[in-house]
Amino acid sequence: MPVADTSQHISGVAERYASSLFELALEEGAVPAVTADLDRFQAMLDDSGDLKRFISSPVFSAEEQVGAVQALATKAGFGAYFTNFLKVVAKNRRLFALPGMVKAFRIIAAQHRGEVSAEITSAHALTKAQENELKAALKGVTGKDVAIAVTVDPSILGGLIVKVGSRQIDTSLRTKLSTLKLALKEVG
């Protein structure tokens, strides 16, 4: 099953790698395992500034990158498919595109399940109950099940930014304050 057209915000490199990983995982019946590994990797990436710097640094040779991702995968207990995927990405010097690959994989997997992907940005972490309410509300709007990816960004101060496909709803306090500031400038 060829998969395409995930998003305009994902690079072609990231989409091609993610599509290849998804198709392999689908053929091997390993989509849930690979998804779990991707989620754990994303959590590691979110928590570690060193890991972020490593994947974005052109200073390391391909051999050093392969060795480092092998050690990371072994320590994290990633499955064989995801470990081999990381090694191929490192060998081809594409580690910088890993965040986009994770995002593209999630979108492709959601499309395969007949879901719509939504990116939620919140000033604070959402509870499971809030996530479920949000999913239900978005399902009412889209008519499809919704897979959400929540990002915490304290700079929005409050509220949410919701992106579904090419649509965005910005109810953040930062945006409301900016709008108010512009309105006051026009009056004064």
Curated annotation (Swiss-Prot):
Q: Which of UniProt's keywords are assigned here?
A: ATP synthesis, Cell inner membrane, Cell membrane, CF(1), Hydrogen ion transport, Ion transport, Membrane, Transport
What membrane topology does this protein have? Peripheral membrane protein
The entry describes its oligomerization and partners as: F-type ATPases have 2 components, F(1) - the catalytic core - and F(0) - the membrane proton channel. F(1) has five subunits: alpha(3), beta(3), gamma(1), delta(1), epsilon(1). F(0) has three main subunits: a(1), b(2) and c(10-14). The alpha and beta chains form an alternating ring which encloses part of the gamma chain. F(1) is attached to F(0) by a central stalk formed by the gamma and epsilon chains, while a peripheral stalk is formed by the delta and b chains.
Question: Any keyword Calcium?
Answer: no
- Tell me where the signal peptide lies: none
Q: Which Pfam families match?
A: OSCP
Function of the molecule: F(1)F(0) ATP synthase produces ATP from ADP in the presence of a proton or sodium gradient. F-type ATPases consist of two structural domains, F(1) containing the extramembraneous catalytic core and F(0) containing the membrane proton channel, linked together by a central stalk and a peripheral stalk. During catalysis, ATP synthesis in the catalytic domain of F(1) is coupled via a rotary mechanism of the central stalk subunits to proton translocation. This protein is part of the stalk that links CF(0) to CF(1). It either transmits conformational changes from CF(0) to CF(1) or is implicated in proton conduction.
- Per its record, how is this protein called by name? ATP synthase subunit delta
Give coiled-coil spans as residue ranges.
Answer: none
Q: Where is it predominantly found? A: membrane
Q: What's the family?
A: Belongs to the ATPase delta chain family.
Protein location:
Cell inner membrane
Q: Which Gene3D superfamilies match?
A: N-terminal domain of the delta subunit of the F1F0-ATP synthase
Choose one Gene Ontology CC annotation of this protein and give it: plasma membrane
A GO molecular-function term, please? proton-transporting ATP synthase activity, rotational mechanism
